[in-house]
Design a protein with these regions (language model features):
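Non-catalytic terminal segments and appended small domains
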Residues: 1-165, 171-243
């Protein structure tokens, strides 16, 4: 059956042919995978003067905005991969229904700078049980869970025209030799919807209008002790919704 979208429907559809997977390990909003270290971080630097008002990374509005941008595909089963120093490997998953492929060194690793090769033991690619369809003109940007700083693997970033191609088989760069055990539910990759558009761009010196726009923008933030940037965002959203 061919999936179709109504012209006014702005929906992303994820599906699987694996019975029960949507209940056991579903694709989720990326905001459900905010890393623990960020959650535990204080907004203010501890043991500083109360009036110093020195904030930490948690006060940076770009961080929570980034965490909410898309969707996360969690690993759907336990996985064990053993990579020997001579390049031999074997893998085992907790369910024989889940299959894995390998990108040989000649496909990726051997083309990297030396320092990057040192951090690449093997590239593993799952036969991902999830498929996705986006509205016309919308691609998905595949990203690693950057701020999770996973010591075992990193998924390679890239873009997929998911309005016409619905497979998402992630390329996992394993960092370590020996046995790597990755548990079911580990966030595998983040997917951010991006609209395919072409933009013109200009590089020039500042104009009076540029300076005025910057001063207005800066004052919206500087005129508040806290949440000036966030309040500017809310005002912009309200204006957008009224148009």
């Amino acid at each position: 059956m061919k999936l179709k979208f109504k012209k006014d429907k702005n929906e992303i559809v994820w599906w699987t042919n694996m019975l029960g997977l949507p209940e056991v390990e579903p694709v989720q909003l990326s905001q459900n995978f905010i890393p623990d270290w960020f959650i535990k971080t204080h907004k203010k630097i501890p043991n500083t003067h109360p009036k110093a008002d020195v904030g930490t990374i948690k006060n940076c509005p770009a961080m929570p905005d980034f965490f909410k941008l898309g969707y996360v595909v969690p690993l759907w089963c336990d996985l064990i991969v053993n990579v020997e120093n001579d390049g031999k490997y074997h893998w085992k998953s907790s369910n024989k229904e889940f299959k894995w492929q390998i990108h040989g060194d000649a496909q990726y690793k051997h083309h990297l700078p030396d320092n990057a090769q040192e951090n690449c033991a093997l590239v593993v690619k799952p036969d991902c049980p999830w498929y996705v369809k986006t509205p016309p003109g919308v691609s998905l940007l595949q990203m690693p869970l950057f701020y999770h700083f996973n010591p075992d693997f990193t998924v390679l970033p890239g873009t997929i025209w998911t309005d016409i191609h619905h497979e998402i088989n992630q390329q996992m760069v394993l960092h370590n030799y020996g046995e790597t055990f990755i548990t079911k539910g580990t966030p595998l990759a983040m997917y951010i919807p991006i609209r395919r558009e072409t933009f013109d761009y200009t590089v020039r010196h500042q104009t009076e209008e540029d300076h005025e726009n910057f001063m207005i923008s800066a004052l919206k933030t500087a005129s508040k002790f806290h949440r000036g940037y966030k309040m500017s965002q809310l005002a912009r959203k309200k204006l957008d919704n009224s148009e």
